[in-house]
């Protein structure tokens, strides 16, 4: 996994996970995300670890009008980290 996204949101964790999986990961990013894993921090916070083959395209998808509207509707705030293997 080379990317970590920490998200806070107003919908439930299950709604967040379902929407992000079906609308974003399996639709918009299906060609650049090879695997992913959700970690529930609490009902309104998630850590998403994923392997992304093109971080530039990921950024473009996250800034798309559809993604921006979804974020606004669900009060979603993302912090994105690139992860590098240390040892």
Residue positions per predicted region:
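Short S/T/G/P-rich N-terminal loop/turn motif that feeds into the first structured element of a domain
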Residues: 1-68, 78-87
């Amino acid at each position: 996994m080379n990317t970590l996204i920490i998200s806070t949101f107003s919908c439930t964790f299950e709604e967040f996970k379902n929407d992000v999986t079906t609308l974003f990961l399996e639709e918009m990013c299906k060609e650049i995300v090879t695997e992913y894993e959700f970690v529930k921090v609490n009902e309104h916070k998630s850590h998403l670890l994923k392997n992304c083959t093109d971080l530039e395209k990921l950024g473009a998808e996250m800034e798309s009008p559809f993604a921006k509207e979804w974020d606004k509707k669900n009060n979603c705030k993302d912090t994105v980290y690139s992860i590098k293997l240390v040892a």
